[in-house]
């Protein structure tokens, strides 16, 4: 008789036969049902942070409260724009943008690379390349690449309105309009439904873009995006997902849900730097000149009469200068803080008579260590290498001290590469819509065959890039000469190609195919063999080229 077990099933089922037969079909069905009950979507993807979430069903949602959220974005963006006017920030932004994209004559700032795209014909690849050129022309990117990337970097967001002719969709995108980044914000419309157990499940999530250009005056600079007599719109506009291409900085959202810009870490260091610079200027001006000290003999005058006498004398000899921190000028405005005032001191009868003396100035006016400290903190917040701050220094492209700056420059290089990849989302979206509208491909092929493998290459400075590549190649060839005697005994040729020359799998296959192709074309010379079957100057190294030999014909002529 089979016994009862007290195992796993015994604990929860009150005991059961150990050898009882389990219905695997019913068990699997119950597990599937449990998975389905847990598969209800009850939360949004965390990747949707930084957007406004509205709840509604059908057309019941409204945009109450979105306007105030948009005003918060406007305030943040305007603060970034005001920061960009500071010389230190302007210099840092210029360094970063010039490293992200280089605008040289007769060169396109960005090109599309389809080398890794497989599964499509060469004709489709040519069409993709042509569509990408059309997108670059619509953006006028060849002429405005620096300005567009700089504006995206400063504002921390950028949006384009994609305009298509509804009567001729095959014509593709007709125009790309850059919208004011202060006036637009993504909004997710979430529709929920009540499920069993009282759980609110998310039925659908729709992306919209809320645009309100009515409040476009910059509260920091006072500038308005439009004329005072013209308002672009007196109503709130809501765009569909396919009408707008919107890219933010990609940073983690703040506590208020706003995605900060790339200048956000520099707010505090910049304020400290500006305050320190102003204090340094004020100290230098106040302590540099010798101030006058008036000692007035008031005799036996009463307190009130003495004060009136001093006030009258101060009016005659008043010397008051003020420093305007907004312009850096020295003015005589009375409402500003005085920085070089005279001293007026009364004297009673029996002491010395009226006297005018001087108070010595400061002797430590050249101390700038505190200013340089905050300037370095500012550039550290913006990921700028310290080597970029020395204007009088030369650019180190290679050499003995290359390793000393490699770590900092490598970090900056990766940072700029991340900015390029982030901004490339614009090209990806514009190209996708252009290809689908023109019928070059469909959504499925784009997502499966093109999008995962397409790359956008930004043009860098040609001279510096060439020198860097030459320096790297020379170092690798020097290492190759070092390990060459050990190839075949310790290292294989494949190891040398991949670990010494740092060639990728694609590069190894490509070079081997090119060598075989060039041999077939006869680009490598053939040499005359000697009596032993070898040729003069032969080398036993497996890494060096061995030309094909012609059979020995008894002649010492080495001509081919």
Swiss-Prot record:
Keywords: Capsid protein, Late protein, Viral capsid assembly, Viral contractile tail ejection system, Viral genome ejection through host cell envelope, Viral genome packaging, Viral penetration into host cytoplasm, Viral release from host cell, Virion, Virus entry into host cell. One of its GO terms (cellular component) is viral capsid. It comes from the Viruses. It is found in: Virion. Transmembrane segments: none annotated. Residues 526-560 are annotated as: Disordered. Forms the portal vertex of the capsid. This portal plays critical roles in head assembly, genome packaging, neck/tail attachment, and genome ejection. The portal protein multimerizes as a single ring-shaped homododecamer arranged around a central channel. Binds to the terminase subunits to form the packaging machine. Homododecamer. Interacts with the large terminase subunit. Interacts with the major capsid protein. Interacts with the capsid vertex protein. This is Portal protein. It comes from Salmonella phage ViI.
